[in-house]
Amino acid sequence: MSALLEQKEQQERLREAAALGDIREVQKLVESGVDVNSQNEVNGWTCLHWACKRNHGQVVSYLLQSGADREILTTKGEMPVQLTSRREIRKIMGVEEADEEEEIPQLKKESELPFVPNYLANPAFPFIYTPAAEDSTQLQNGGPSPPPVSPPADSSPPLLPPTETPLLGAFPRDHSSLALVQNGDISAPSAILRTPESTKPGPVCQPPVSQNRSLFSVPSKPPVSLEPQNGTYAGPAPAFQPFFFTGAFPFNMQELVLKVRIQNPSLRENDFIEIELDRQELTYQELLRVSCCELGVNPDQVEKIRKLPNTLLRKDKDVARLQDFQELELVLMISDNNFLFRNAASTLTERPCYNRRASKLTY
């Protein structure tokens, strides 16, 4: 039973390698004895179907030389040649130009799906193997110098240059154009494939102002242009609220999460509670209102708001500079009716050296 499962796993690896264009992995699996005509149990696709679908001409040629059946059908009755979109691969499969115009367009309409599969909407990064990579390792190990690499016989330009590693940028929403770019039918625009920019030394902790302004600051004024004029910036710089990672990350970037409690040193357990403030309304009055509402305190009893350990909040700009999960204390006015401070007198009576008679003496 385990041998059968291992055999199916090897066949699935062969189909995956053919879909990615990994010619070395395909050669390794075929030489180890994996059946090139093995079909998937669900859709009936073989490794030749996948190689033709992804337009990997080198893999198609090798599979045909290894005995792959070009007439095998899927569960929908599709042959491998009907899945390709390149004339070069159709010639490799032995399809004439006259037959191509009659059969291929009609079969493509029949196999068109009403949705875009996930493996086509988010294709894997294409496997690119060049002899230069292997020769460079030989040169580093002291091996012989590599022979000059001749250009490929295929007239189609390579999708990616071998010397540069492009980055996958923002893909367009048209999945069909993305599939054509991956298959090499059209040239890739600069928005999809772009080379990495040259790295230059610069300040470490200076993120872009325009990006962080929309996330962490109060949009009180429209953005001011920061284009330099004669080497200097024109106009005042927009207000920027820095963001420091404190180990916990807020769930919603539109809210400012603060930790608030009532200042009472007589209590052994004086825990904080978390409150949320809208970043569009970071004012002192809003902070006072939300804090008193959550703690059940009358705003008239609040003497001041302290940012721990020893900073007093006085105005709206002080509140705008607050970061997520900062600790605040509400300092209340001491009065006889304030039940929170009744425990302060009881702590003296609990001491063993407390003299009740002496406490009532008047001088």
From Swiss-Prot:
This protein's record includes keyword Acetylation: yes
Pro residues bias locations: 144-164
Keywords: Acetylation, ANK repeat, Phosphoprotein, Repeat
Modified residues (Phosphoserine): S176
Residues in ANK repeats: 9-38, 43-72
Modified residues (N-acetylmethionine): M1
Residues in coiled coil: none
Cross-referenced InterPro entries: ANKRD40, Ankyrin_rpt, Ankyrin_rpt-contain_sf
A Pfam family recorded for this sequence: Ank_4
Residue numbers spanned by region Disordered: 135-167
PANTHER family: ANKYRIN REPEAT DOMAIN 40, ANKYRIN REPEAT DOMAIN-CONTAINING PROTEIN 40
Name the record gives this protein: Ankyrin repeat domain-containing protein 40
